[in-house]
C-alpha cells in the first residue's frame, strides 16, 4: 500500500499534551493530524470502505510488515549557514515525526503496529512538505508454511 500524507508532519512534541497530574492526551492538533492521515489512507484506498478493508488485509495477524517513510521537508537547510548557524541542516529528529504518523496510519489501516519488523526512515529536501509511506509484507522464510503443513498452528518465525 502506498500512501501520501500532505503537509508537514506533526512532531510528537505537539501531538500530545500533559496535565499537571502527568497524564498524556492527544492534543487538538494531534486529533486533526490523525484525521488527516485517515483521509489520506482513504484516498490511497480509493475512497470506498471495501477498498479500505482490502488495504488492511495486506497484513493478517501473522504477517511481518516493512514500512518505508520518506519525509519531504522544505526547511531542512539553516538559512544562516555558514556564518550564523552552527550546522548546515536544522536539527530535526525523525523519530519525533514518526510516532503520531505511525499511530494514525495503523489505526486507519486497522493493523496492529506490533507486526512491523522493519522500518526505513528518510528525510529529503523539497519545495513542499509531504510524507510518502509504503507498507509491504515481508517475504516469509518458509518456516511457518512448513509448520502449518505439519499440523502446527501458524506462528511468526
Describe each PLM feature range.
Residues 1-157:
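Acidic, proline/glycine-enriched N-terminal capping motif
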Amino acid at each position: 500500500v502506498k500512501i501520501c500524507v500532505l503537509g508537514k508532519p506533526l512532531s510528537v512534541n505537539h501531538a500530545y499534551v500533559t496535565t499537571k497530574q502527568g497524564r498524556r492526551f492527544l492534543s487538538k492538533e494531534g486529533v486533526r493530524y490523525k484525521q488527516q492521515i485517515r483521509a489520506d489512507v482513504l484516498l490511497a484506498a480509493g475512497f470506498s470502505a471495501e477498498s479500505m478493508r482490502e488495504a488492511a488485509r495486506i497484513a493478517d495477524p501473522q504477517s511481518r510488515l516493512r514500512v518505508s517513510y520518506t519525509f519531504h521537508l522544505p526547511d531542512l537547510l539553516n538559512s544562516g549557514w555558514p556564518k550564523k548557524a552552527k550546522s548546515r541542516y536544522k536539527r530535526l529528529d525523525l523519530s519525533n515525526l514518526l510516532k503520531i504518523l505511525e499511530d494514525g496510519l495503523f489505526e486507519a489501516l486497522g493493523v496492529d503496529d506490533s507486526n512491523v519488523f522493519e522500518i526505513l526512515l528518510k528525510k529529503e529536501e523539497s519545495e513542499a512538505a509531504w510524507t510518502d509511506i509504503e507498507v509491504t509484507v515481508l517475504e516469509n522464510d518458509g518456516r511457518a508454511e512448513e509448520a502449518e503443513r505439519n499440523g502446527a498452528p501458524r506462528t511468526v518465525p
